[in-house]
């Protein structure tokens, strides 16, 4: 009798572990969202989809194999206009220097859009030739003009837009 009671509890717990994430996923990616972003790492594109229609498609740079861009479901967060760049506390950035807002060498350029804190962003680039390549340390790079255009669209949609990143 005691074993059956514990099996029931474990079964209920397992059901919750499976059902709750599915429900959260469904609410996160509701089809009634007016805008969403789809990133294809393989195609090196970022699509803005509004009411089911592709409104814009942008070329992007993605993470190198040694520093891949994360895949999964996210929401855009804070939009930081004219950001400074502070080297993250990672090995690859050990000898890099702080870059003030507006500096030509600032890798963020005009805007950075948070999508997975603390180190993954969509942002402009000071190396537009990297678009279409696996060139970043995990962030999604866009030309400065495209990044600004995307940031304005996200702001117009309320600031927190669902985003899927897939291979």
Indicate where each model-derived feature is located:
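N-terminal Sec-pathway targeting helices
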Residues: 2-17
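Low-complexity, intrinsically disordered short peptide segments enriched in small/polar/basic residues
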Residues: 14-17, 34, 151
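Polar low-complexity intrinsically disordered regions enriched in Ser/Thr and small residues
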Residues: 11-14, 66, 75, 127
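Cell wall/extracellular polymer interaction/catalysis modules
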Residues: 4, 21-91, 97-117
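Exported/periplasmic cell-wall-interacting domains
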Residues: 30-32, 71, 90-167
């Amino acid at each position: 009798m005691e074993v059956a009671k514990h099996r029931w509890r474990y079964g209920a717990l397992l059901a919750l572990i499976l059902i709750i994430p599915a429900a959260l996923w469904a609410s996160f990616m509701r089809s009634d969202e007016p805008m969403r972003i789809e990133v294809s790492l393989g195609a090196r594109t970022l699509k803005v989809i509004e009411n089911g229609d592709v409104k814009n498609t942008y070329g992007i740079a993605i993470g190198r194999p040694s520093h891949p861009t994360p895949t999964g479901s996210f929401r855009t967060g804070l939009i930081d206009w004219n950001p400074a760049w502070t080297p993250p506390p990672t090995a690859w950035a050990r000898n890099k220097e702080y870059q003030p807002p507006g500096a030509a060498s600032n890798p963020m350029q005009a805007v950075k859009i948070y999508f997975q804190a603390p180190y993954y962003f969509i942002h402009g680039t000071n190396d537009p030739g990297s678009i279409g390549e696996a060139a970043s340390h995990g962030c999604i790079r866009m030309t400065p003009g495209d990044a600004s255009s995307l940031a304005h669209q996200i702001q117009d949609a309320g600031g927190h837009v669902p985003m899927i990143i897939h291979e």
